[in-house]
Amino acid sequence: MQTRAPWSLPEATLAYFPNARFVSSDRDLGAGAAPGIAASRSTACQTWGGITVADPGSGPTGFGHVPVLAQRCFELLTPALTRYYPDGSQAVLLDATIGAGGHAERFLEGLPGLRLIGLDRDPTALDVARSRLVRFADRLTLVHTRYDCLGAALAESGYAAVGSVDGILFDLGVSSMQLDRAERGFAYATDAPLDMRMDPTTPLTAADIVNTYDEAALADILRRYGEERFARRIAAGIVRRRAKTPFTSTAELVALLYQAIPAPARRVGGHPAKRTFQALRIAVNDELESLRTAVPAALDALAIGGRIAVLAYQSLEDRIVKRVFAEAVASATPAGLPVELPGHEPRFRSLTHGAERASVAEIERNPRSTPVRLRALQRVEHRAQSQQWATEKGDS
């Protein structure tokens, strides 16, 4: 059952509650916002969980999911996927966050010979993707796992963890499907169990963190993962409140947050719960640590000439991707030497100039793309590798 907030809210905050006007916002920080209808869209759209997607049934497959920058991702990765055959035959694409299957569908439709391996930690998402992509079943493998376990997933699918994949795609952050289901506890505008697990089979919930972590640990989570400037006040309030009765629902936590954050701060910057909910979700799902492991593993999994694209929706994720990518395109030759040492050349080259953003047209079509940052790399061949290959070929 959906319930309204039990208090009077200022105009700036009302935008995040049921029946309020639509407000475009950061995908993650606005993730708990209430459903509403996006005004004056040129395509049939509906807002679910604060994210605008196509009306269910309005698309050709009726799955109501509009993938972000799908065409641009296709353009960036296709050269690596068509280097054997124009239809993608013999190429392998790893979709590390398959979700509802929107990006995967674009690749499988556009490249009728392509093999795709899709990963997701959410079994519900895998069920949706399986239904959406059923016509490609002979070229599709789905694996229930986190993306930091992609090496094991590749092995399970019959591929090596190193140098076996031609393309890799990450679409990071919470999914609209997870937000749509109130019982998952991701949204702060409806009352639901304080859960927030992307994978319901894992043990740790948001309620466990809120009710058992000490004050210092809570403040650290809110500060690091939510960049919440009132982290200490909120943590202290949580500890005082739970001493009387444990937190069990999102509404109870939202009420505490509204009391803990000073009134002037509540009037600006959106809903007072948004940063705390983001922080708890990241902590519950170990999102940033998983990403720190997954991106280097993905780079290792790429074959020479292979390409990777990552879509990030908030600064914490993008910083990790940016740092790993910067290291990948850097030379290993010691600074100060006048020439590049053989075998010390960069392993990768950048395919994007910094982070690409969605165009005005893309944002108008799909407001969910507003905060996205897209980065892409290609694995390149060292001269030493090329010479070794030529020598081996001559010896054979």
Curated annotation (Swiss-Prot):
Catalytic activity, reaction form: cytidine(1402) in 16S rRNA + S-adenosyl-L-methionine = N(4)-methylcytidine(1402) in 16S rRNA + S-adenosyl-L-homocysteine + H(+)
Please provide the Gene Ontology terms (biological process) for this protein.
Answer: rRNA base methylation
Ordered alphabetically, the record's keywords are: Cytoplasm, Methyltransferase, rRNA processing, S-adenosyl-L-methionine, Transferase
Kindly state one GO CC term assigned in the UniProt record.
cytoplasm
Q: Which GO terms describe its molecular function?
A: rRNA (cytosine-N4-)-methyltransferase activity
Does the keyword Cell membrane feature in the UniProt annotation?
Answer: no
Q: What is its main location?
A: cytoplasm
Residues bound to S-adenosyl-L-methionine are 101-103, 120, 147, 171, 178
The cross-references to InterPro entries, in alphabetical order and at most eight, read:
RsmH, SAM-dep_MeTrfase_MraW_recog, SAM-dependent_MTases_sf
EC number assigned by the record: 2.1.1.199
Report whether Transcription shows up as a keyword of the record: no
List the subcellular locations. Cytoplasm
PANTHER family, per database record: 12S RRNA N4-METHYLCYTIDINE METHYLTRANSFERASE, S-ADENOSYL-METHYLTRANSFERASE MRAW
What function is annotated for this protein?
Answer: Specifically methylates the N4 position of cytidine in position 1402 (C1402) of 16S rRNA.
Note the NCBIfam families from the entry. Answer: 16S rRNA (cytosine(1402)-N(4))-methyltransferase RsmH (TIGR00006)
Beyond the main fields, what else does the record say?
A: Was identified as a high-confidence drug target.
Family assignment from sequence similarity: Belongs to the methyltransferase superfamily. RsmH family.
Q: What is this protein called?
A: Ribosomal RNA small subunit methyltransferase H
